[in-house]
């Protein structure tokens, strides 16, 4: 498996500068990562720097809390696409989910998907803040929408993706819904394990060390 092409090489630190983004982009080019994941403010820059490459631009909406007004999320998504984003990773409104306002969640996701059309939409459910039962319910809920992916984590909570998270999501998702694992993925072993559990995209800021793990493993044979 060529893991490089299913990695979203990620830099979402609030202190990231344009120079940091340019370094991220050069790393993505060097290692042929499938995508970079950056804050919306840097999408225009990335579009310019990634001209004539196949590297996708992923950006985040309603990040990292998910509690913005839905109309703001929609506008943010629309502007991100206009600036050159290929994919949107939006954060679910976790408070609304906790109080079981499921129709609100469905409407918000579908409105954003309508806003971005054929572009890929991933919904972050922030598994760290959910019980196993809630992860199952959130997975079923996202499966009932027009979203393309369910994503485990923002990377800004107290933990990221876990093996248990992936197992629950896999058991409860629809056939059409893909899985992106993110948050705390720091080594090849985690990535390989999550891949076996059904994840087909990975968000990580530790991409370079993971690729080194992969190269070292290949050199052993």
From Swiss-Prot:
Q: Which residues constitute the catalytic centre?
A: 89, 151, 180
Give the enzyme class.
lyase
Q: What is its EC number?
A: 4.1.2.4
An individual GO BP term: carbohydrate catabolic process
Gene3D superfamilies, per this entry? Aldolase class I (3.20.20.70)
User: What's in the keyword line of the UniProt record?
Assistant: Cytoplasm, Lyase, Schiff base
Mention any one GO cellular component term assigned to this protein in its UniProt record: cytoplasm
Which family does the similarity line name? Answer: Belongs to the DeoC/FbaB aldolase family. DeoC type 1 subfamily.
Q: State the protein's name.
A: Deoxyribose-phosphate aldolase
The beginning of the lineage is:
Bacteria, Bacillati, Mycoplasmatota, Mycoplasmoidales, Metamycoplasmataceae
């Amino acid at each position: 498996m060529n893991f490089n092409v299913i990695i979203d090489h990620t830099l979402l630190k609030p202190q990231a500068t344009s120079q940091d983004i340019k370094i991220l982009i050069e790393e993505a080019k060097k290692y042929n990562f499938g995508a970079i994941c950056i804050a919306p403010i840097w999408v225009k820059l990335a579009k310019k720097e990634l001209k004539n490459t196949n590297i996708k631009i992923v950006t985040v909406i309603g990040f990292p809390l998910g509690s913005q007004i839905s109309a703001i999320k929609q506008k943010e998504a629309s502007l991100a696409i206009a600036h050159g984003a290929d994919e949107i990773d939006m954060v679910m409104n976790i408070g609304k989910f906790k109080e079981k306002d499921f129709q609100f969640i469905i409407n918000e996701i579908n409105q954003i998907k309508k806003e971005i059309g054929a572009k890929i939409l991933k919904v972050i459910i922030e598994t760290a803040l959910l019980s196993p039962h809630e992860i199952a319910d959130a997975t079923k809920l996202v499966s009932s929408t027009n979203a393309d992916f369910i994503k485990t984590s923002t990377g800004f909570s107290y933990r990221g993706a876990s093996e248990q998270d992936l197992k629950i999501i896999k058991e409860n998702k629809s056939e059409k819904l893909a899985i992106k694992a993110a948050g705390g993925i720091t080594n090849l072993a985690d990535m390989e394990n999550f891949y076996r559990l059904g994840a087909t995209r990975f968000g990580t800021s530790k991409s370079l060390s993971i690729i080194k793990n992969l190269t070292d493993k290949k050199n052993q044979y």
